[in-house]
Amino acid sequence: MVTTRCLCVILTLWMVSSRPSASILPGAPSFGAWWGTPESRKIARQADNARRTGDLASAETYYRQGYDDAVHRHDERAMVGYLNGIAACQITQLRYSAALVTLLEAKSHAKAIGDRADLGAIAVNLSNVYLQVRDLDAARKVLEDGRAALSSLRRPYFMPNLLIQLGRSHDIQQDGMARSFYRQGIDAAREFGDRQLEALGLDLLGEERLGQGDLNEAAKVIEEGMHLRERFSPKDLDLSWWRMGDLKSRQGDWEEAARYTDLALNAKGAAPEYRLKHQRGMIRMAMGDRAGALADLREAVQLSSRWRLEVLPASSSLTAANEMLDGFVFSSFIEAAASEALRTGNQRWAAEAFEAVELNRAASLRESRSLADAWHKRVPAEYWDTLARLRRADVEALAKHAPNDESRRLRLELAEMEAKAGLGFLTKNSENFYDQTSLIHFQQGLRTTEVVLSFYLGDRESYLWAVTRDTLKLQKIAAAEKIRGEVGGFEDAVQAGRPEAVELGERLYQELFGQLGQEAVAKPSWLLSLEGILFEAPFAALVTEQKGGKVSYLVSKHSVQTIPGALLLSTRPDAGIGRFLGVGDPIYNAADPRWGEQKKPASFLNLFHTPTTAGTAQTGQYGRLVGSSEELKTSAANWGSQSTILLEGAAARRDMFVGELANGPSIVHLATHVIYPLGKQQGYIAFGLGPEGRSEFLTTTDVASLRVPGAFVAMTGCGTGTGDPRPGAGLIGFTRAWQMAGASAVLATSWPVRDSRGDIFASFYNHLRNASPAEALRLSQIDMLDSGTWRAVPSYWAPYQITGGAR
């Protein structure tokens, strides 16, 4: 049985609103003042009583009354306490977005009065919110704040909670340190007399032990936690029954596993229902109850989709949440439903499995794109200042070849501002989205020339759905590991120009598409919904057949477009021959004669070069892109717009480019270097030297914050189409960032391409005047294939790809 550890575990932190004043470090201002009026004491008692009976709505109402009273008395310390009580209610009800805003307000007040103890507690609460949605970077940063507060205080009241939170963080990282932190937190909770927290710590340690395969210790600590709850907090027993159900499943005792899981479900307590439904579905599947299992797993998907509406509306949290949901809830249902469809021929399960694949895949980008509009309207002015500071911090990180603490801190600040700006927007739009995802609605939007080919890669077997306007066909293909090997070998052979690329391409084509029905094969427009290693496959160079010594490539028959998800398809706006904005041939080095003799400070790009001896002058690592100037000119000429802006040489500056975007170009063409010194997810578009002699750049974070509504974007630099493939979220990189910025489609490269005059782009823009981007790329690739020159080889034309939902 597949389970995921440390997800959506309720760590309710009531500590700020009910802590004794004796917990304050000697010398700090007395905290007892906020209980100092009869009204405040009455409110606190009412809130605690409501909380203990599980009436969280009433508890939150009482805490809000207390907060209003504290505001009236100008008592910031009391305001902090009540805000944390409100946040705890919100966290327990899985209202993470609201909890974030409440906690950030509490943090602001705590900073104003210099209360380190409150700040430490708030850091623990914030980490809880971030861990719930798997935003690990944000959680680590606020936990570091909590540890800093812990080191400056003597036995602060939040110490047990902090230690357990650190255990959760290390558990998710699986770095071997979780067990020690859990044990410390459990011991501290016992010393503080907090039996509820002690039981929760035992639960989490039990989950960690289950994940390590230590069933004996897991059983011991989970049962210990259950006995504690039986004695001190029986209303929380559903949390123990949930874990006991998981434990019994691991032990193969399916009857007991089902009994405990049913107990937890019937209790309707704090254990998340979608996790329990998923757990029972897997138990029923193991017991041979296919119908019951499918019903439970299907409901788990529906419940988790509603849970997603409460995820923090910041791009990092949305990506993490989709990745987490894909990892167990969606995958379990998809595999069960697809298997049932193939076993019985029941089209209902084939269709529902397809919808589940595409719902989770599309949600992350769609929600992030929607939020991008909200951010621009609602983020404070300091957001852009913070973004600029992050850019400077990234410069330092690049110079050191490693991320730095300042970058992490600033990214957290941006995420918090994004989340606050998106509140009230995500839920409304997401609810509309989920109401519109029926298969009929989707299929009616397809053209008669199109087929959507949607892949799901599984450990045991994978699946391919071929969906046209009238049909949906499901087929089983090889497991992910086999496909990974075949794609890797094929890509390497094509890139290197080796002759075995033909045989490997034909084999991979048969593996992926050999079972396609005639209707799908006949469709000229292929829309690919991908995951994992498939993002790296040069589909255009797949070999459909060899006959009489002649090789037929897929590109000869089909245009290929990678889509962010089948549920995100749209029609490309018809803007005519609109404005063309191009950037190319920047000045990358002070040695460039165009820079001028009077300006010779070191280039930023030189920072990547380490001199062999002290005092040796650094030389640039990146050469001039001489051919990019011709590429820009021929591309613009073949597009034929009456409004063309080409930023070359000294004009190829970041600020000039961003300024021109405000004029709404239809085409954005970037013929620049693109570098990935710190990993595929965060890249840098390198512009020319600025006034200080340092190169300027745009990161993927910067790009996602731009606005290019409806524009077509071409990035012809090295490997611009690469990124970090994330389950349930897609490829995280420049192509996704431009789509978040509003681009209708993006042309990018899978590997470095030889610098030339841009012949393929001259052909591409000529065809784009009368064709879709995917078809224009196909025709230009055929032009290269038939050219009889060195450009005819797949290693030249195959790495170009079109990504986007508009067609």
What is the predicted function of each stretch?
Residues 41-52, 78-92, 117-132, 157-171, ...:
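Conserved alpha-helical positions within TPR/SEL1-like repeat arrays
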Residues 54, 94, 134, 173-174, ...:
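Residue-level detector of the short coil/turn that links helix A to helix B
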Residues 59, 65-66, 99-106, 139-146, ...:
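Tetratricopeptide repeat
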Residues 143, 222, 489, 532-534, ...:
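A domain-level signal for caspase-like cysteine endopeptidase catalytic cores
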Residues 290-553, 568-605:
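Amphipathic alpha-helical protein-protein interaction segments
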Residues 666-763:
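Catalytic cores of nucleophile-dependent amide-cleaving enzymes
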Residues 756-807:
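An often Trp-containing, charged/polar helix-loop segment at the C-terminal end
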